[in-house]
């Protein structure tokens, strides 16, 4: 059984860059690039901030699963920690695998992100 790292520990720098880790959590957002990459923001409840997981189109399930992930889908991701090339985070995971544990049955009815909320 793989040992699962907490995202809070990864973001706090408790695990060194270059280390291979496994995380479990829920997709907050997915962005796709023209370069054949998907950027997944994953959270596990251990931190308010998500971890960015970079999935390349060379992954076996890239077209069948990764490109269909929506907010709320549960995943297990394994990969290597690396210094982030983007803004907003210092570390990211270069994914070797992203396995879907659970799908959101009706993504259109899934609660809107808080960013879209206009008030309480």
Regions found by a protein language model. Name each.
Residues 1-120:
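Class II aminoacyl-tRNA synthetase catalytic cores and aaRS-like
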């Amino acid at each position: 059984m793989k040992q699962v790292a907490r995202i809070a520990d990864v973001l706090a720098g408790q695990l060194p860059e270059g280390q291979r880790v496994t995380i479990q959590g829920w997709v907050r957002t997915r962005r796709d690039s023209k370069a054949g990459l998907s950027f997944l923001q994953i959270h596990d409840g251990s931190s308010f901030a998500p971890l960015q997981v970079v999935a390349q189109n060379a992954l076996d399930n890239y077209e069948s699963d990764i490109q269909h992930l929506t907010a709320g889908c549960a995943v297990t991701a394994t990969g290597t920690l690396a210094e982030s090339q983007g803004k907003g985070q210092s570390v990211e995971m270069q994914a070797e695998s992203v396995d879907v544990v659970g799908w959101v049955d009706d993504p259109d009815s899934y609660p809107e992100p808080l960013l879209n909320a206009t008030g309480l």
